[in-house]
């Protein structure tokens, strides 16, 4: 299970080069390296299961999305590529895309505003949903369901509208 992730700033334009490289190294290259090592072990055995923890944040494409969101979007594409390349080998690929999970890290980053995060799940709920998806060898699981629906609706809007809505949200937080 490749599940590392780091987050800097809210918008991509707030990142510096060092933060951007660190985000991409951890969020994307970390999954790639883990998948490569695991795949090389699993291929001779003709069985195995690669799992990536991505994020629902990677589903929306808009200009000012954070590098975290964009790197998780790349993880989603990486999982699709591995799934296709490994089809018929006995190796499964599951991509887990959670929304907000009530972790200590989320609290450290957001403090009291954490309670305002939409559809916040407990760690236990997230683990149970993830484990079920892994056990069932699902290709992809997006949760919580209400956030999945909200993102599905938002993704129908033009990127400029999505960007505007997120900028409004950021201004309200300030």
How would you label these PLM feature ranges?
Residues 3-8:
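Conserved NAD(P)H cofactor-binding loop of Rossmann-fold oxidoreductase domains
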Residues 62-66:
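Active-site loop immediately N-terminal to the catalytic Tyr-X3-Lys motif
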Residues 11-12, 16-24:
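Substrate-binding pocket helix/loop in short-chain dehydrogenase/reductase
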């Amino acid at each position: 299970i490749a599940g590392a992730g780091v987050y800097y700033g809210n918008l991509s334009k707030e990142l510096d080069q060092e933060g951007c490289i660190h985000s991409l190294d951890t969020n994307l290259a970390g999954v790639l390296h883990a998948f490569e090592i695991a795949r090389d072990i699993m291929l001779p055995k003709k069985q195995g299961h690669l799992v990536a923890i991505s994020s629902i944040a990677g589903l929306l494409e808009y200009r000012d999305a954070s590098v975290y969101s964009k790197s998780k979007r790349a993880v989603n594409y990486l999982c699709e590529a591995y799934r296709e390349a490994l089809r018929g080998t006995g190796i499964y690929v599951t991509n887990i895309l959670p929304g907000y999970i009530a972790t200590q890290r989320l609290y450290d980053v957001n403090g009291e505003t954490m309670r305002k995060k939409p559809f916040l799940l407990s760690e236990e709920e997230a683990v149970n949903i993830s484990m079920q998806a892994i056990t069932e060898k699902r290709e992809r699981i997006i949760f919580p369901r209400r956030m999945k629906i909200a993102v599905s609706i938002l993704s129908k809007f033009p990127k400029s509208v999505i960007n505007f809505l997120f900028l409004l949200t950021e201004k309200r937080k300030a």
